[in-house]
Amino acid sequence: MATGLTLAVDIGTGFTTAAVAVDGRLEPLRLAPDGPMRAVVSLSHDGRLLTGSAAADIAATHPDRAQPCPLQALENTDQVQLGSTVIPTIELIAAVLRQVVHEATRHSAGPPPAQVVLTAPVRWSGAEVDRLRAAAFRAGLTNVTLLPEPIAAARWQADPAGLRPGSTIAVYDLGAATFAATILTATPGGFEIRGEPGGNPDFGGNKIDDILLRRVADRAGKTDSRAWNALWADPSPSGQQLHTRIRQQVVAAKEALSTTTSHTVRVGGSVGDVEITRADLEASIDGELRATVTELIRTAENAGVRPGELAEIFLVGGSAQIPRISALLLEMSGVRP
């Protein structure tokens, strides 16, 4: 049996998170100043694949050289074009894994991890799993275990003393690109998937960003429609950089509104500032969020579980932190996340 450092990695559609096992306990690994590492991978002008904040900086000025969601790219295709260069998608994931291993090794001040646990989307088939394994091998990782994302989330969040074997839980996972709903049964050794996982592969945090951006555009247009339309139609490099900056502010607004009731998006020029409130956000996406809760309930019922029989609902994914989601889950299922 391998000994030494164990590293757990979750490459999400928006961010990559990781943890290391220390004395039998998992400790979160800081991959960026604010914790998780952005999922984006970019090609530098000297041909290197960059990850994290360095990749995000390139994406802001040269979006054609960036892949914002390498995990989704790995699922959908064998290769992508960054700038004028064709890159195998397994190389994108390998670049992310190399960076995570580097941070884990620096954190532990010892040898590289002896064991690596990688999460994989629960809906993935053998082909996608094989590509993920190939990416890990390309990154120099040989002792790799793959774990379905909802099981990994349950292991991370569950209180071992609070769940009896046979208890049923739900995992509500709203990532950057997709929504997944999974029902799990607690076992003496962990968790098992119960029934067929559900979800929506076309709805995630990115769609929420799009909806919120339209709300900002509507407000900006009412202030100075001519200036806003000219700004958003500007195809120049500086115009594209401004578009990226505004979109980044919209994403920041969505994240901030999980803990505050209002946030300002600074457009500049004659448009000035646009204030967005939590009520604005919730009103804009209420129908979409209700649909995700309905899908979670449908998934549970198809697995033979009534919502009231769920012992827990675990929230996973950055956009799952939107307060309205917890309120809707309690309202529609009777279970408080």
PLM regions and their residue ranges:
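Hydrophobic alpha-helical hairpins/lids featuring a short glycine-rich hinge
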Residues: 82-84, 90-97, 122
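Transmembrane alpha-helix boundary signature
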Residues: 104-108
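Short, acidic loop-to-helix structural element flanking the phosphoryl-transfer center
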Residues: 93-102, 292-298
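Oxyanion-binding/catalytic loops of NTP- or PPi-dependent enzymes
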Residues: 1-73, 86, 109-114, 118-337
